[in-house]
A protein has these predicted regions:
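N-terminal amphipathic alpha-helix/helix-capping segment at the start of soluble metabolic enzymes
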Residues: 1-8, 19-23, 93-102, 124, ...
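N-terminal small/glycine-rich loop or linker at the start of catalytic domains
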Residues: 131-159, 194, 201-203, 256
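Catalytic domains of carbohydrate-active enzymes, especially glycoside hydrolases
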Residues: 167-182
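Metal- or metallocofactor-binding catalytic centers and their adjacent structured scaffolds
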Residues: 39-125
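Active-site mouth loops of central-metabolism enzymes
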Residues: 104, 145-165, 183, 212-217, ...
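Catalytic core of soluble alpha/beta enzymes
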Residues: 185-311
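Structured beta-strand/loop patches that form or line metal/cofactor-binding pockets in enzymes
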Residues: 1-59
């Protein structure tokens, strides 16, 4: 059993939507295929992965560093002890060989994209969905249900509040009971109007979360907190720079409702620092680490261990 090739292509997202920081018409994404010599049901097993939007495609790093480390490794060193499947943890260690710790940057996205494709291949070789493979690795019963919500409400050229309401109604019609919209890309007064329009539309059928995408400084974050606490929101997300733990902790003094962050923290060390210094409240706040952006599922499992250590 071996990995025959690792293929990456970078494609534009090509959408005119934007949040408080990002114009997605300029954004790209990496699509990765990990090609194995394994055949299942008459088809070659290929694992696929892609990076989340909000970070650019990582073709350069993948081709210049990480792809060759996988392909140049002794094939047996990338397998589990039984030789019956790929071992994502061992492959991850090969990818990260000769890399200094810290300073994660775009490297975490390149490795994460590859790692997700490797796990996809491992699940296909194992003949089961990834969630079941993971549960078995932990000696647990797989839960086929998971909380999901509809993330939308982007700023869009010519999009007025009626269009925003129609978008949110569409999510409800598809069965979602939590929807999310962007804030911070307009004035606080305009954002208030957008929030009120959505709340009027969804009524008691759903809950609304809002996401600032890390746009606010402390003063603006507090101003929004004072405005947002007037409404029954599901959460107030990513208020300031993700590494400004003191800002995150300070906002809790002004916002009693649930807050959410973690999407742009890329390691278990960053997660630990958020828990140590970010003032996160275990009874109400949400942690949102993104596997594909943060070195993949291998590192995400380490992050879960950190969370368990901190209760």
């Amino acid at each position: 059993m071996r990995i025959l090739d690792v293929v990456e292509t970078t494609k534009p997202i090509s959408s005119p939507i934007r949040n408080a920081y990002i114009d997605f018409s300029k954004m790209t994404s990496s699509l990765v295929a990990v090609v194995t010599d394994v055949v299942r049901d008459g088809r070659r097993v290929v694992g696929y992965g892609f990076n989340s939007n909000g970070r650019y495609g990582q073709g350069g790093l993948i081709r210049e560093r990480f792809r060759d480390r996988i392909l140049e490794a002794e094939p047996a060193s990338l397998l589990n002890d039984e030789g019956s499947n790929l071992d994502p943890h061992r492959i991850w260690a090969k990818m990260m060989s000769n890399e200094k710790p810290g300073g994660h940057g775009e490297r975490s996205v390149a490795v994460g994209t590859l790692d997700m494709a490797i796990w996809d291949a491992a699940a296909k070789i194992g003949g089961k969905p990834l969630f079941r493979l993971l549960a078995e690795m932990k000696g647990k019963e797989a839960n086929p249900r998971v909380f999901v919500y509809a993330a939308g409400g982007y700023y869009y050229p010519g999009k007025d509040n009626s269009a925003l309401q129609a978008e949110m109604r569409g999510y409800l019609n598809r069965g979602y009971n939590v929807v999310k919209m962007k804030i911070g890309g307009a004035s606080i007064g305009e954002d208030r109007g957008r929030i009120e329009a959505v709340l009027k539309e969804i009524g008691s059928d759903a809950k609304l979360a809002v996401d600032a995408n890390g746009r606010f400084d402390l003063e603006t974050g507090i101003a929004y907190a004072k405005m947002l606490r007037e409404y029954p929101l599901f959460w107030y997300e990513e208020i300031g720079d993700p590494l400004d733990y003191a800002l995150q902790a300070a906002i809790a003094e002004f916002y009693p409702g649930p807050m959410a962050t973690g999407e742009n923290l890329f390691s278990h060390q960053d997660a630990r620092n958020l828990l140590r210094y970010g003032g996160m409240r275990p009874d109400r706040d949400w942690l949102q680490f993104d596997c594909a952006l943060s070195y993949g599922l291998v590192e995400y499992l380490r992050t879960l261990d950190v969370l368990a250590q901190h209760g």
